[in-house]
Design a protein with these regions (language model features):
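Intrinsic disorder at enzyme termini
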Residues: 1-3, 105
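Fe-S ferredoxin-like electron-transfer domains
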Residues: 51-52, 60-152
């Protein structure tokens, strides 16, 4: 697949072809590579808000959200190396730690995925929130916001 409307880059050490304007996440999905993602949905504008889909791009200092980063020729992308996986897992863990313990009743009748896609990705990446994070996230606030009379 080497046409003028496609470019070639490396994804986890494998050469892949991307169509012009295609994001790293779209290319990865097309080539059978799974990258965690929560806020991306085909057909909608990608915003990269959840940060679960971050990848490392060789030569760049910061991780990039694969859902809104357009692939470019020659780039080397790593979605499953230690740095990317650690960040992906941290995002999932932080989100899980702030969820209700019993989950959301609407998501899964069997109870296997109490938090929907979040539970699914956490299960796939073997992420479980640390009890200390859950305690912090669920602790009642000790500070009362008195910045406005309606809030007291």
């Amino acid at each position: 697949m080497s046409t003028s409307s496609s470019i070639e880059f490396e994804l986890n050490g494998q050469k892949v072809n991307a169509l012009a304007g295609e994001t790293i996440l779209q290319v990865a999905k097309r080539h059978g590579e799974e990258i965690p993602h929560l806020c991306y949905k085909e057909g909608y504008r990608p915003d990269g808000n959840c940060r679960a889909c971050v990848v490392e791009i060789k030569g760049e200092r910061t991780l990039a959200p694969s859902c809104c980063r357009v692939a470019s020729a020659g780039m080397q992308v790593f979605s499953n190396n230690e740095r990317a996986r650690k960040s992906q897992k941290m995002v999932l863990e932080m989100l899980l730690s702030d969820m209700p313990e019993d989950g959301f009743k609407w998501s899964d009748e069997a109870g296997d995925l109490p938090h929907g896609e979040l539970s699914d990705w956490a299960h796939r990446l073997e992420v479980k929130p640390r009890p200390a994070l859950q305690q912090i996230a669920r602790a009642p606030s000790q500070v009362t916001d008195a910045s406005h009379s309606a809030m007291v």
